[in-house]
Curated annotation (Swiss-Prot):
The keyword Cell inner membrane applies. NDH-1 is composed of 13 different subunits. Subunits NuoB, CD, E, F, and G constitute the peripheral sector of the complex. One of its GO terms (molecular function) is 4 iron, 4 sulfur cluster binding. The gene is nuoB. It is found in: Cell inner membrane. Transmembrane segments: none annotated. This is NADH-quinone oxidoreductase subunit B. NDH-1 shuttles electrons from NADH, via FMN and iron-sulfur (Fe-S) centers, to quinones in the respiratory chain. The immediate electron acceptor for the enzyme in this species is believed to be ubiquinone. Couples the redox reaction to proton translocation (for every two electrons transferred, four hydrogen ions are translocated across the cytoplasmic membrane), and thus conserves the redox energy in a proton gradient. It is a peripheral membrane protein. GO terms for cellular component: plasma membrane; respiratory chain complex I. NCBIfam families: nuoB_fam, PRK06411.1. PROSITE patterns: COMPLEX1_20K. Belongs to the complex I 20 kDa subunit family. Keywords: 4Fe-4S, Cell inner membrane, Cell membrane, Iron, Iron-sulfur, Membrane, Metal-binding, NAD, Quinone, Translocase, Transport, Ubiquinone. It comes from Yersinia pseudotuberculosis serotype O:1b (strain IP 31758).
Amino acid sequence: MDYTLTRIDPNGENDRYPLQTQETVSGDPLEQHVHRSVYMGKLENAMHDMVNWGRKNSLWPYNFGLSCCYVEMVTSFTAVHDVARFGAEVLRASPRQADFMVVAGTCFTKMAPVIQRLYEQMLEPKWVISMGACANSGGMYDIYSVVQGVDKFLPVDVYIPGCPPRPEAYMQALLLLLLQESIGKERRPLSWVVGDQGVYRANMQPERERKHAERIAVTNLRTPDEI
């Protein structure tokens, strides 16, 4: 019986021996298979929803204020508004025990490093609310000593407009709509994690865009004496 030897060309195309064909797999294949499972996917999603439900209904604010907007913030803790109904009445004196911080008032240049250090001392998960025109964009203080928006050095999650905003605006931003809705859609590791946490946060639609169609559809406007 005759045998024929065929030399394999490493640089050529070889159907039988694809020496140059390599597949790069990112991550653990077993873990990817588990996450692709319908049962495990639903179970993991249910665990995320349960953990986020606890987080969004027990938000502990860090207690500090910068200006007059802080007065409107603490007004929501009175019996008239009763922010305790939503589990956010536990004021923390230490940033290590707080879930979110509210920058309420005018942020001066000398105060910015202090606020940034307090934010870095907060443990994950943590959120930031910018309350009032001064915190959002500097307000009427277009001057060298005032930071033109705290988002220059902090990742802001929710902006509250107004000069100053009413307590109802603070409660709407914190509890009734914006921050709780954002926390409910987050996906972060459910176990101890060292290093990058891989947090997924859904994009929040601005209230101006969300209510644009409703406001444009209004044809009968109220008279000024009814406002």
